[in-house]
C-alpha cells in the first residue's frame, strides 16, 4: 500500500482521533463509495457544528435524516479530515430526549414558577412571553429585559437578535456566551490595533519556523489544526514548538520547549521576552518607528467582582480600566527592564534556560513565529493585558501580518468570530466593530436599520456575568437565552446564577435542542432546530465565512432560533415599546409591529423566495414568504463594506468553501495590514494598521498583577477548568453520542500523584472539591492525558452531573468582562478511598 506524505498525515490524524476516544478504526477505507445513484445518499457541504476551527464536512442525508458525515476534501481548512467529534456529527441531532414541543412550568392549568413542565403550543408560548416582556417594559423600561446569546448562533440569527433587542426593544442587555471565551481577545485587538480579529490565517502554519502555544491545548481543542502543526514540525528540521501552560497536557508531546508556569505569571514571562528583545538588540527599529506607538495602560484595575467586594473597593482604577497615556520607546524599555530572566524564572517556576530559548525564538531576526492562544490567555483577570503583551512582542520584532509571522487568537465556538464579534451581539457593540457609546456609530446603525435617530441607547447593557447578578438583584426580570447553557457554563452558579433564574419576580426562557441544566432551571423551554435543520452561516477563527443549506427538517414542532426571534417580533407594536418622542420623529412607523419595522422594512424582505437554490428546503422562507436569510445578510454586510470588513455577495458563499474577509472585488484577504495582501493598505506603505487614524499599532506597558484569589492554608490548591477532546463545552451534544460518552463518561479531578499520596488518596478515590462558593464530588485521576504540577488540580466542565462551576469564582477581566475560569482556590476532601 503506497501512501503520499499527505495521505499518511490524514490517515494518521484519523487514527489518533479514534484512538484517543478508544474507538476502532478500519485499517483501510479506499473503497469508500459516495455517489448518490449508488448509495441513495445526498451529499452537501456544511461547516462543522463544534469548535472555531471551521472544518468543512460533507453531510449525507437519506429519507429526511442525516445518516453520515466525512471530512470535505475540497476544504482548505481541514483538507478532508475531522477530529473525533467531527466524525460523529451525524448523531448529534438524534438524542432520545430531543425537545420537540414548547414546555411551560404549570400548575392547575396556569403558569406557576414552582410548577412542572407541561407542553403548550407556540401560540401560548409567545402569549406568555409577550405578556412578561410588556409588563416589565411598562413597569421598569428596557433595562428590565435581556437576552443571552451565543457564538453558536448563525450569522443571521445573531443579527436578528441584535436588531430586535437594540433597535426594537431598545435594550442593550444582549450578550453572547462568547463573553466567557473571546471578549479579552476582542479588547486586545481593539486596544492594540483599533480593529478586531486576527491579521493572519491558517496558511501561516505551513509558512512558519516556530509555534508558541500560550494557554492553548491545540492537540485536544483544535485537533485538526494541530495535525497541520504536527505535519509542519515533522516535515522541516528547523521548526520548533514551545508550549506554555499551568499544567502539562497532550500538546506537550510535540514540544521542543515545554514550560509549566505558576498561574498568572504568564504576564511576567511576556514582559521578560519584550525586555530580552530590547536588551539583545533584536528590536526591528525601522518597523517600530514607522508603524508603532507606545502607551502606558491603567494599573490596579480591580477584578470585575461586585462593586462592594473588598478587592473592588481597594482598586484605584476600577472605573478607568480601559484607559492609557502616551509614552515613548525609551519609557517602555525602562518599564520592562525589571522583568529579567532571573525574575521570570524565579516567579514563574520555569527553568531559566527554557525561558531564554523561548525569548530567542522571537528575537532571532530570520526565524518566523506564530503565537497561538485560547482560553489560557482569555479566561484571565488580566486577559486583555495578556493579549496586548503578546502583540507587543510581535510588533517590536516586526513579526506580524505576513506569511508565517502571526499572533493568532484561536476561537472556541463555530461562530464566535462570525456572529458574536462581527455581528456585534455583545452588550456594547454593533456590527463591524461599531459600539453603542459612539454617537456616530449609533447614527450609522439607525440609518441602515431605518429607525429614528435616538432609537439605540447610548448606555452599555449588562454583560454576561452582570446579567446573572442583575437577575439575582431583581433589576433584570425577563431573560431569554438561546444556544447556550449558562447554568452549567457560567461561573459561581449556586451563588450568582441560579438565584436569579429562580427569583419569583423573574421569567426565564431557554431555547435549546435538549433538556440541558439551563433548560431545567427555566420557566419556559422552546424547542430549537439545530445545524443542518436550518440554513446557516458561521465565521471561523481565520475570518472565513461559511454557508450551508437546510438539509433536513427539525423534529416535531422545533423551530430555528431565527424563526423564534422574527415571529416573536410580531407581538409588539412601536406604540408599546417606543416612547412618544421617538415615534414623533417617524410617525409613519406608529402602530406598526416590530416585525414590519425591522424585518419587513424594504431591505430584509427584498429577496423573493425564488432566489433560494432549487432543491433545498428553507422553513423560514416558507414561514415569512421571502428569502429572509439573504435579506438579513445583505443588510448586515452594508455595515462593513468599504470599511475593511467587506463581505462577498450572499450567493458567493453557497458556492465556495468559505471566504476570508475583507473580500474586495471577489478576492479574499489572507493577511491583513500588509501591502500586497490587503487591498486597504496604500501602495508603498508596506504595513498600515488602519484601525487607528494614524495607521499605527500600540505597544502597551502593562505590569504583572496578582490573581483575584490564590491558594492559602484553608484552600491550598489552584483549580483550573477546561475541556477534553471527546466533549464540547457542556456536553449537551457530545454526551448524547454513545461512542463519545462511552469514551469519556465522567469528569475527573486530575491531580499530581504526590499530592494524592500526601492526602492519602489514590487513583479512583472519590473526593469533594470545595471552594468558598460551592463544592462537587468526583473521582481522582493521577494518570492520563493531563498532568498538573503539585498544588494544582484540573477538572473539565462538560459533565452535567459534576457542575464544577459551582466552585469557580466570578472574577472577570475589568476591561473585557470575561470570566477567569483558570484560577481559584480549592481544597480536596476524601469521601471514599476506592
From Swiss-Prot:
EC number in record: 1.9.6.1
Database matches in Gene3D superfamilies: 2.40.40.20, 3.30.200.210, 3.40.50.740, Dimethylsulfoxide Reductase, domain 2
Range of residues in the leader sequence: 1-29
Binding sites annotated in the UniProt record for [4Fe-4S] cluster: 48, 51, 55, 83
Coiled-coil zones: none
Enzyme kind, highest EC tier: oxidoreductase
Residues the entry annotates as binding substrate: 797
Gene this chain is encoded by: napA
Entries under PROSITE patterns matching the protein: 4FE4S_MOW_BIS_MGD (PS51669), MOLYBDOPTERIN_PROK_1 (PS00551), TAT (PS51318)
Database matches in SMART domains: Molybdop_Fe4S4
Keyword set includes Iron: yes
Free-text description of this protein's post-translational modifications in UniProt: Predicted to be exported by the Tat system. The position of the signal peptide cleavage has not been experimentally proven.
Assembly behavior: Component of the periplasmic nitrate reductase NapAB complex composed of NapA and NapB.
Record-level GO BP terms: cellular respiration; Mo-molybdopterin cofactor biosynthetic process; nitrate assimilation
GO molecular-function terms, A-Z: 4 iron, 4 sulfur cluster binding; electron transfer activity; iron ion binding; molybdenum ion binding; molybdopterin cofactor binding; nitrate reductase (cytochrome) activity
Binding site for Mo-bis(molybdopterin guanine dinucleotide): 85, 152, 177, 181, 214-221, 245-249, 264-266, 375, 379, 485, 511-512, 534, 561, 721-730, 805, 822
Gene Ontology cellular component annotations, sorted alphabetically: membrane; nitrate reductase complex; periplasmic space
InterPro entries cross-referenced by the UniProt entry: Asp_de-COase-like_dom_sf, CT_Nitrate-R-NapA-like, MoPterin_dinucl-bd_dom, Mopterin_OxRdtase, Mopterin_OxRdtase_4Fe-4S_dom, MopterinOxRdtase_cofactor_BS, Periplasm_NO3_reductase_lsu, Prok_molybdopt-oxidoreductase
The protein, known as: Periplasmic nitrate reductase
Reactions catalysed: 2 Fe(II)-[cytochrome] + nitrate + 2 H(+) = 2 Fe(III)-[cytochrome] + nitrite + H2O
Similarity section: Belongs to the prokaryotic molybdopterin-containing oxidoreductase family. NasA/NapA/NarB subfamily.
Amino acid at each position: 500500500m503506497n501512501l503520499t506524505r499527505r495521505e499518511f498525515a490524514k490517515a494518521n490524524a484519523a487514527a489518533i482521533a479514534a484512538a484517543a476516544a478508544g474507538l476502532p478504526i478500519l485499517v483501510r477505507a479506499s473503497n469508500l463509495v459516495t455517489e448518490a445513484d449508488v448509495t441513495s445518499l445526498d451529499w452537501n457541504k456544511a461547516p462543522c457544528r463544534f469548535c472555531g476551527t471551521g472544518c468543512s464536512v460533507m453531510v449525507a442525508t437519506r429519507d429526511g435524516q442525516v445518516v453520515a458525515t466525512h471530512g470535505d476534501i475540497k476544504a482548505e481548512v481541514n483538507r478532508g479530515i475531522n477530529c473525533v467529534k467531527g466524525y460523529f456529527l451525524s448523531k448529534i441531532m438524534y438524542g432520545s430526549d430531543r425537545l420537540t414541543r414548547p414546555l411551560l412550568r404549570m400548575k392547575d392549568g396556569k403558569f406557576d414558577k414552582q410548577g412542572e413542565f407541561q407542553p403548550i403550543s407556540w401560540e401560548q408560548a409567545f402569549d406568555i412571553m409577550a405578556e412578561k416582556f410588556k409588563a416589565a417594559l411598562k413597569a421598569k423600561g428596557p433595562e428590565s429585559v435581556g437576552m443571552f446569546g451565543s457564538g453558536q448562533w448563525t450569522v443571521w440569527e445573531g443579527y436578528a437578535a441584535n436588531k430586535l433587542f437594540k433597535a426594537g426593544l431598545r435594550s442593550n442587555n444582549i450578550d453572547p456566551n462568547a463573553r466567557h471565551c473571546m471578549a479579552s481577545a476582542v479588547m486586545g485587538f481593539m486596544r492594540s490595533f483599533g480593529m478586531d480579529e486576527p491579521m493572519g490565517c491558517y496558511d501561516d502554519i505551513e509558512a512558519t519556523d516556530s509555534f508558541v502555544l500560550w494557554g492553548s491545548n491545540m492537540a485536544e481543542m483544535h485537533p485538526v489544526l494541530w495535525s497541520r502543526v504536527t505535519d509542519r514540525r515533522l516535515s522541516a528540521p528547523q521548526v520548533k514548538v514551545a508550549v506554555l501552560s499551568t499544567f502539562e497536557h497532550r500538546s506537550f508531546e510535540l514540544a521542543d520547549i515545554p514550560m509549566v508556569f505558576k498561574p498568572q505569571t504568564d504576564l511576567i514571562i511576556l514582559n521578560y521576552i519584550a525586555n530580552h528583545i530590547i536588551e539583545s538588540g533584536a528590536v526591528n527599529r525601522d518597523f517600530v518607528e514607522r508603524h508603532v506607538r507606545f502607551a502606558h495602560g491603567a494599573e490596579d484595575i480591580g477584578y470585575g467582582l461586585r462593586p462592594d467586594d473588598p478587592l473592588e473597593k481597594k482598586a484605584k482604577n476600577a472605573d478607568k480600566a480601559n484607559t492609557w497615556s502616551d509614552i515613548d520607546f525609551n519609557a517602555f524599555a525602562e518599564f520592562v527592564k525589571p522583568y529579567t530572566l532571573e525574575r521570570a524564572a524565579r516567579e514563574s517556576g520555569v527553568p531559566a534556560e527554557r525561558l531564554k530559548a523561548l525569548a530567542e525564538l522571537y528575537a532571532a531576526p530570520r526565524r518566523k513565529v506564530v503565537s497561538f492562544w485560547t482560553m489560557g490567555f482569555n479566561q484571565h483577570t488580566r486577559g486583555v493585558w495578556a493579549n496586548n503583551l503578546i502583540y507587543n512582542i510581535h510588533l517590536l520584532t516586526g513579526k506580524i501580518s505576513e506569511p508565517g509571522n502571526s499572533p493568532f487568537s484561536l476561537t472556541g465556538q463555530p461562530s464566535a468570530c462570525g456572529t458574536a464579534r462581527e455581528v456585534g451581539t455583545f452588550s456594547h457593540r454593533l456590527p463591524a466593530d461599531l459600539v453603542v457609546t459612539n454617537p456616530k456609530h449609533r447614527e450609522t446603525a439607525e440609518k441602515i436599520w431605518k429607525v429614528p435617530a435616538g432609537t439605540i441607547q447610548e448606555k452599555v447593557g449588562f454583560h454576561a456575568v452582570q446579567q446573572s447578578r442583575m437577575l439575582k438583584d431583581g433589576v433584570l426580570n425577563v431573560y431569554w437565552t438561546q444556544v447556550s447553557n449558562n447554568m452549567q457554563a457560567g461561573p459561581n452558579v449556586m451563588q450568582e446564577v441560579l438565584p436569579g433564574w429562580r427569583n419569583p419576580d423573574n421569567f426565564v426562557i431557554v431555547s435549546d435542542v435538549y433538556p440541558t441544566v439551563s433548560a431545567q432551571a427555566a420557566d419556559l423551554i422552546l424547542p430549537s432546530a439545530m445545524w443542518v435543520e436550518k440554513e446557516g452561516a458561521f465565521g471561523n477563527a481565520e475570518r472565513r465565512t461559511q454557508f450551508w443549506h437546510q438539509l433536513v427538517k427539525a423534529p416535531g414542532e422545533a423551530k430555528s432560533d431565527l424563526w423564534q426571534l422574527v415571529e416573536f417580533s410580531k407581538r409588539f407594536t412601536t406604540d408599546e415599546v417606543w416612547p412618544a418622542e421617538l415615534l414623533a420623529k417617524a410617525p409613519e412607523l406608529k402602530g406598526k409591529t416590530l416585525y414590519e419595522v425591522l424585518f419587513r422594512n424594504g431591505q430584509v424582505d427584498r429577496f423573493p423566495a425564488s432566489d433560494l437554490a432549487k432543491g433545498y428546503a428553507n422553513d423560514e422562507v416558507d414561514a415569512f414568504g421571502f428569502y429572509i436569510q439573504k435579506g438579513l445578510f445583505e443588510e448586515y454586510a452594508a455595515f462593513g463594506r468599504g470599511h475593511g470588513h467587506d463581505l462577498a455577495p450572499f450567493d458567493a458563499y453557497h458556492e465556495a468553501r468559505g471566504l476570508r474577509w475583507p473580500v474586495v472585488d471577489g478576492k479574499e484577504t489572507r493577511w491583513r495590514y500588509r501591502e500586497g495582501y490587503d487591498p486597504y493598505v496604500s501602495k508603498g506603505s508596506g504595513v498600515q494598521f488602519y484601525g487607528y487614524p494614524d495607521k499605527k499599532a500600540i505597544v502597551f506597558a502593562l505590569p504583572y498583577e496578582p490573581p483575584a484569589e490564590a491558594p492559602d492554608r484553608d484552600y491550598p490548591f489552584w483549580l483550573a477548568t477546561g475541556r477534553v477532546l471527546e466533549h464540547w463545552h457542556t456536553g449537551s451534544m457530545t454526551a448524547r453520542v454513545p461512542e463519545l460518552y462511552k469514551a469519556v463518561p465522567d469528569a475527573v479531578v486530575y491531580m499530581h500523584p504526590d499530592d494524592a499520596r500526601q492526602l492519602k488518596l489514590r487513583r479512583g478515590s472519590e473526593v469533594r472539591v470545595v471552594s468558598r462558593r460551592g463544592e462537587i464530588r468526583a473521582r481522582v485521576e493521577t494518570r492520563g492525558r493531563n498532568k498538573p504540577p503539585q498544588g494544582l488540580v484540573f477538572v473539565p466542565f462538560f459533565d452535567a452531573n459534576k457542575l464544577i462551576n459551582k466552585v469557580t469564582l466570578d472574577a472577570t477581566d475589568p476591561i473585557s468582562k470575561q470570566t477567569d475560569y483558570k484560577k481559584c482556590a480549592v481544597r480536596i476532601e476524601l469521601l471514599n478511598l476506592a
